[in-house]
Amino acid sequence: IGALTHVGQSEVIAGNGAGQRFNDAGATKILCGQQEQGNVALTERCEGLAETFSGEVVIEFMGLDADTSEQQNTINAALAADTDIDGFMGVGPVITLSGLRAAQDLGRDLTIGGFDLTPELIGEIEAGNIAFTVDQQQYLQGYMPVLLLFLNVTNQNTLGGGLPILTGPGFVTPDNAAEILALSEVGTR
């Protein structure tokens, strides 16, 4: 189709990294909550998690982001029904926050991880309420293609060798959350 390369994140590789982080945190059973049915990328995030996580992963649709009350109630019910769940992975920022609220409602101490960035999510990471979020570095996903096209047109450069140029996964943790939040406020993260 004439594409030079793909600049982005492999959702499976990103999920793999999340699985390793849950292993490091000592989790044994994770609920991987999805906010859209049939979205292949979100499914790949959970499947990648399951590939590297040494415990059990339960993948469930938890309701749409548009109705966070229903979403949180669905997560509450899943957590109440299975007290062995000690980790929650949201495959987007809104559902990650819904998972945190559900755990808080039930008084459950879960290791919580997520995907993507919002100021509220980064704030919860900085506060220590969420362990991490996967950062696909969307700024790079916009910046790098423009740079690559410019270099191709003006200097006949190509990068990637026909393979994707990955922008993630990066991880936002309590160690770097304040800096990432500051960078997001100026529009580069």
List PLM regions with ranges.
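A residue-level marker of the well-folded mature domains of exported/periplasmic proteins
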Residues: 1-189
